[in-house]
Amino acid sequence: MSESKNSGENTLSVTPTKTLSLKRPVEAGTVRQSFPHGRSKAVVVEKVKRRPIGPGGDGHPAREAAPTPAPAATVTAPPPAQRPAAPNPTAAPTTPPAAAVPNVPPPAPRAEVAPPSAQPAPAAPTAATPPAQPKAEPVPAPIAAQAAPAPVPPVPAPSAPVPSTSAAPAAPKPAPAPVSQAKPIQTAPVQTAPAAQASASQTTGPRPVAAGPRPATGAAKQATATPQRGAASPAQRPQTGGGQRSGGQQRNQSGGRGGPGRGESGSSRTPTGVVLRSLTDEEREARARALSGARIREEEDRKRAAAEAKAREEREAREREERAAAEARKAEEDARRLQEQEAKRRSEQEAKRRLSGGEPAPAASPSVARKPVMTATAAAPAAAAPSGRAAVTDEEETKRVIRRPGMPTKVIVPPRPTKGAEPKSRGRLTVATATGGEEEERTRSVAAFRRRQQRLRGHVNEVKEKLSREVILPETITIQELANRMSERGVDVIKLLMKQGQMAKITDVIDADTAQLIAEELGHTVKRVAESDVEEGLFDTVDVEEHLVPRPPVVTIMGHVDHGKTSLLDAIRHANVVSGEAGGITQHIGAYQITAPNGSPITFIDTPGHAAFTAMRARGAKVTDIVVLVVAADDGVMPQTAEAVAHARAAGVPIIVAINKIDKPDAKPERIRSELLQYEVQVESLGGDTLEVEVSATKKINLDKLLDLIALQAELLDLKANPDRAAEGTVIEASLDKGRGPVATVLVQRGTLRVGDIIVGGTHWGHVRALIDDKGATRSEAGPSMPVEVLGFSGSPEAGDRVAVVETEARAREITEYRERQRREQAAARGGQARGSLADMMSQLKNAGRKEFPLVIKGDVQGSVEAVVATLEKLNTDEVAARIIHAGVGGITESDITLAQAAGAVVLGFNVRALKEARALAEQQGIEIRYYNIIYNLVDDVKAAMSGLLAPTLREEMLGNAEILEVFNISKVGKVAGCRVTDGRVERGAHVRLIRDNVVVHEGKLSTLKRFKDEVKEVVAGQECGMAFESYQDMRPHDVIECYNVHEIKRSL
């Protein structure tokens, strides 16, 4: 058989006398190859088996396939005489140091043949007495052994063969062969016994002659630099058995290409009877991929083994250090323990000697004292000294003389410390011990530890006294800031609020009263301060008595609606204000000044009598000096009359009762006097102190008498004011005029208001641009008790705000900013409390499903807007409510339309109109604008719209009853109940209620009603019919059917 790499030499020759081999099966496996220092490598092993078909014709004995191990044995042209008997590796001498090469893996997987001069042949053992070698077991060869190395340049062989006795080198321990990329090596016969080797050497006698001059044969290719590696340190040799080494030598001697086992010559090719073929491209690629994968795996295994070895070395070094440290600590502890025992023993001996009165005990020699404690690892701590107590005792008794009767006087000499011994540390830190470099830990005594524990225990049980702090509280403060000022936890403050029924967060704002309660509850003192210090000296400064002069009285006319208040004022002023009022009712508060018959001026304030204008009446009562209570003689005391009495009592002003409309035939003044007694108003005619007068506004009866009573009451009050000071007053009404801007009706109470003064009213300030009196005339100044319209405010102040004149704009700006900030904080505090209180939380849950009617309200004056908002809020119920999106003074603008469009609200204008641009935008967006000049109409329309949002009331109308006699199952219709109408009638489409055993099991509608086979509209009592219900089939005999209609009834507020 022959094999060639050239395509032209692919020839097959078959000899009849040779055996024909089949395809060799291959078995693959993996073995772990170990190396010194804990390194290992995974090697892939392929096991190739040969199965002979016929007996051999070459005379060789039957051989079994035995793969050889991976290490390649060294070959230096062994003679055939030495091949059967392999020398014992243990008896062979090692390679000289000159031929040793470090055990470094070659850079490339190719083997080089060592030159003969670099490998001197040492003396080999006698071939006659080879050691008995056991039969080598088949060992899987690694893949490195199956790959032949790449061809190398031929190495010149020795000129003459070496004799068998001296040329056989000692077989060193094989080293791992490098991985190479060549075709696998054929299986070699395993050396089984010396007898078989001898027969093989006889058969191949002349083969060594041909093996010499052919260095490129299989044996020469496999002869790598193994002698150099074999000469390395023994720790790097793999632990293999003698049988494996013999097998390796046998493979190199007989199995290599061109070797002795091949034939007489490497160049001569004789037919062997085995058919070979060249490898295909797919097989070459597969083998190349397998070899590349093996190299990659080998590289990964090498890196992994290196990392594991490094980690193992570090771990072993760390363990060694830990063991050494533990042994050192144990030795030091033993030395210290022995030292203490020795010191204790000496102290006891010294104490016994003193008690017995004998001689001092001789000091132990240093060697004896240190002998039990001297160790190789702890020599320094072995030097022990007496304990501190014994040393002090010896020092005290050194100079003491013991005199006993019958005993010579002696001076007790304490034992001298051993030379080089160091005194034991007494737990005290000195400069010597601190700088001596001793590493002994300075321990604390048990007594010191107990004292520390008692001290700590005493601090724990000590009752800390609570500190009382002075807490400065502003008008509003957050919970966090309050807790910080009290040095308390915020959680404790929140707990106190929860006890009071308020759910609050630590960032919520609370008012000063709540903060004061919390601070006092926690044991602190409170000092209330406010930012209102900026307003000090602004109002209520005391005037000098000499500067006071009489001023006109301010009279407020109050009473029920339609009792003639404005008519009475018109009769006094000789004017006709009633004719210009919408609906004949007063909806604004008016201020006028007239001259009495005696020449003294009197200021009148006309208030609305409608129930919606309660706030106006309250403001009028606050700024007035006298209240004129107008009561119609034909109508009696009404609710607003009683309310006016209450306002006057709250303001503390006197009341003059004016019984109006006495000219009517049904007038009953005496009934008015008796009815006022129910409200604790007792007139003079009934023995009281309240002045009364019967008047008629239309007939102008007793008007002068009324004015005289007003002058008398003012004289009794002794009304005075200082006109030569900064003006103070009250805003009675405020509005936003299109041409004049913000306009405020101010009643000057003290001082004199002049044009150009800097005034502050509420959250707005400005320069007085103009002063207009009640007759429309422009005035340069206004004295006490004079009502004027003031122009020049930066915005519309609210009705009821106090007005004062300040010196500079900076002061005015500071005051207004403080008031604005205060208003925001108070609103936030109210909102936070509203969110947190339990009652408001329940109210929010109750109003969760309530429908809302959004509104945008614009009015002519501030008082009218307040009245409209208050009236609409009274219409709210649990089901529907009017939600005021925005309420303001002035005409309807584009911003109002945009706000209404975003909220889906209706715009209501009270005595105002919309601008042209606002009307165009409202038409474009589809926003409804409604105008009103009478508050009755506005309230009625809103009430009707809110009533439409209420769910209607459902009322049932019973029609009749029927009883099911039988249930029929119709294929296309379903189940149909055959019924008899017991009373009333049954209508198709009506509501039905199915009752079974007095329990309602279904409510629905009657979908089908038939009389025989005809569809009918209704069936009266006593007749039978068929019924079918919508989406219900579970009908049973003897069920009762109630038929009824449902009517919806609209609701109203």
From Swiss-Prot:
A GO term for molecular function: GTPase activity
Region of interest (G4), residue spans: 660-663
Compositionally biased tracts (Low complexity): 64-76, 83-102, 178-220, 375-386
Chain residue ranges for the region called G3: 606-609
Highest taxon above the source species: Bacteria
Ranges of biased composition (kind: Polar residues): 1-20
Entry-linked CDD domains: IF2_eIF5B, IF2_mtIF2_II, mtIF2_IVc
Subcellular compartments: Cytoplasm
Gly residues bias: start-end ranges: 255-264
InterPro entries the UniProt entry points to: EF-G-like_DII, EFTu-like_2, IF2_assoc_dom_bac, IF2_II, IF2_N, P-loop_NTPase, Small_GTP-bd, T_Tr_GTP-bd_dom
Predominant location category: cytoplasm
Region of interest: G2: 584-588
Key words of the record: Cytoplasm, GTP-binding, Initiation factor, Nucleotide-binding, Protein biosynthesis
Region (G1): 559-566
SUPFAM superfamilies xref list: Initiation factor IF2/eIF5b, domain 3 (SSF52156), P-loop containing nucleoside triphosphate hydrolases (SSF52540), Translation proteins (SSF50447)
Annotated HAMAP family: IF_2_B
Family indicated by similarity: Belongs to the TRAFAC class translation factor GTPase superfamily. Classic translation factor GTPase family. IF-2 subfamily.
Protein name: Translation initiation factor IF-2
Species this chain originates from: Beijerinckia indica subsp. indica (strain ATCC 9039 / DSM 1715 / NCIMB 8712)
